Amino acid sequence: MQCLLRALGATPALVLAMSASAQTADKASLYPAAAAGDGATTGGYNLSRWAEDWRALCDPAKRTDPIDALKCVKLTPSGDVYVTFSGEARLRVNHTTNPNLRDSPAQRQDIVRLVGGADVHVGEHLRVYAEVAHGGISGRELGAPAATLRNDIAVQQLFVEAKGRVGAVDVGARYGRQEFVDGPNLMVSQRDNNTIRYTVNGLRAWARTETMRVDAFDLKPTQYGDLGTEDDVIDPARRFSGVTLGFVVPKGWFGGAKLYVDPFFWRRRNKVGAWGGRVGPATRYYLGTHVFGEAGRVTIDWTVNHQWGTFRDQKIDAWHLLFAQNVRLGTSAAAPRLGFHADYASGGGGYGDGKLRNAYAPFGNNIYYSYGLFLTPSNLITVAPTFSVSPTPRLRLSAAVQRAWRANVHDAVYRASGAPFAGTQNVRDARIGDVLQLQAIWTLSPRLSVTGRYEHLAAGPSLTRAGYTSSDFLAGWISFRF
């Protein structure tokens, strides 16, 4: 934590230089906010709370309750300096039968998340964001909970940001501990499933026009301890850097579609990479493209990327082909949606034979394939029809039936953590199993929601022939945020 504060202290020169050279920025950003790499904002709320914009509530006439006043607390008479407060309380229960897919007593996790944030704006050009979090867990058959589940208190985010407009270009830089989601969700995510979310430390800078953008970054992950703030340190063994471009597809090309194309070139370095029981330095490069958005009633999220580099003395040659799409079965925004996702993550070589062909996501969404954390996009092929419907404006129901296979039967089945299910590399049947996924979200208000989730993983021969079994996952949580 001290090194993070020292690093933040070194940034005033950068901030002052950028503020001096920038013109006064308009309140609206040039590039579409939904595609700027900061996540989705719905009803004013974003998973990354600093991505929210509550400036309208600086006008007392637009506030509807006392909590609205916390969104713009003026620190100067003019209101140029103000702070936006945010917070979340989430109570959750997870019940998992046969944890780790072994025939064993069920696990119950009773989880508490508490988060508080303050976003201090100093004029149009400068802001400082700080966020602290607490994670608590109790229950049965817990084992040794990770520091992302049990943590007395953590400085989850702390950064300084400077931005402005130079001519017809928005420019900016953010330095410190932050969430980073500028890429496909299966590749980079803040992992909201964790009680303490995934964060990184370093620099992100950008330049954006109305139709294109370039973002560059150099980041190291946070290595959390489970006590106070002093044991939450910058991980010295891992580093993630790269460049992401963004282009707005002209609306006239597809009849008014809102589509975006994001090519990216990344590098991930890991001094303690692990595959097949072997540990050593790894450097992995990513070159790919993310295409996403809406075209009429169709929503798409497509990613293709090639990965290469070295792990110890082994060359890397891997691919991700990730395709999710759905169609709205009606004209209203609340109409049911029918779709499917089909994904390919190459595999092979994890145990030292030939090239390492296992695809690897830097820190992607770890619950997309299984809330039980039993699958990850490495040596994996999946196909899943999906359906969602809102029988009432406040209730959203969704379902999926996912079939999963190994891409290479000479390599293992991998968990969300990246660790293999030991012994599966010796089974020569490709079928991993099927996953039934059901979810209901009841949004009582923009601030309060209740979620229920059920999954059943029916283990296939890739797992059962190595001694693993099926599992049920049942969870419920209530979340209040402001």
At which residue positions do the language-model features occur?
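Outer-membrane beta-barrel pore domains and translocons
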Residues: E88-R92, A133-G135, G176-F180, L219-P221, ...
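Membrane-embedded beta-strand positions of outer-membrane beta-barrel proteins
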Residues: F85-G87, A130, A173-Y175, A205, ...
